[in-house]
Amino acid sequence: MRKLPRPFYERDTILVAKELLGKYLVHHDGLEEKIGRIVEVEAYLGQHDLACHSSKGLTKRTKVMFGPAGYAYVYLIYGMYYCMNVVTEKEGIGSAVLIRALEPIKNIQDRTQGPGLLSKAMRIDSKLNHRDLLSNDFYIAEPNSPTDFTIIEKPRIGVHYAKEWANELLRFYIKDNPYISKT
C-alpha cells in the first residue's frame, strides 16, 4: 500500500471524492491495525453548499474544514455517532468528503454501512479530529492491486434542509457493492 500524498487532497472536492472510492482507510489504534476499503462517500463543497457545515462560516467546530487539505474532520452526531471527513482543496474553502461506508478488509468485525457505524468499527472518535492523514497511524492508501468499478452518483443522504443543494448528485458509491449504506 502507498499512502496518499498531500497533493491528492488539495484538488477539486468532487474529483477527490470519486478517487477516494476503492482506496483503503487505515487506522492503527495501538491495539491493532484496522483497514477498510472506501465504497461510498459524499462531497461537501464549501461555504456556498448549504448542506456543508462550513456554510455557517468559520467556527471552532469547522476550523479544520478550512484547511489545510489532507486532515480528518471528525464530529459527533445525535450525541452518539462520529462521522469522519477528509478535508479537501486549498485553504479557506471549507470543503470536505464524508466517508459513508467501508468494505471490511482487515480486523473489522462490526457493520460499516454508514458513517457512524464505520467510525465505531474503525475506532474513529473525536481524538482523531484534525489528525493529519499523512500520519503513520491514521491514513488513506492506494491498494497494491486496484480494481475496476462503476461509480453511481445520487443525492446526498439526510440533507433535505439544504434547499437546492439537497438534490445535487454529490453522493458517490461503487455499483453493486454490498457494503454501501442503506437509504
Curated annotation (Swiss-Prot):
A single GO BP: base-excision repair
CDD domains in alphabetical order: AAG
Pfam families: Pur_DNA_glyco (PF02245)
One Gene Ontology molecular-function label: alkylbase DNA N-glycosylase activity
This enzyme's EC code(s): 3.2.2.-
Gene3D superfamilies on file: Methylpurine-DNA glycosylase (MPG) (3.10.300.10)
Alphabetically ordered keywords of this record: DNA damage, DNA repair, Hydrolase
InterPro entries referenced in this protein's UniProt entry, alphabetically: Formyl_transferase-like_C_sf, MPG, MPG_sf
Family: Belongs to the DNA glycosylase MPG family.
Protein name: Putative 3-methyladenine DNA glycosylase
Native species: Legionella pneumophila (strain Corby)
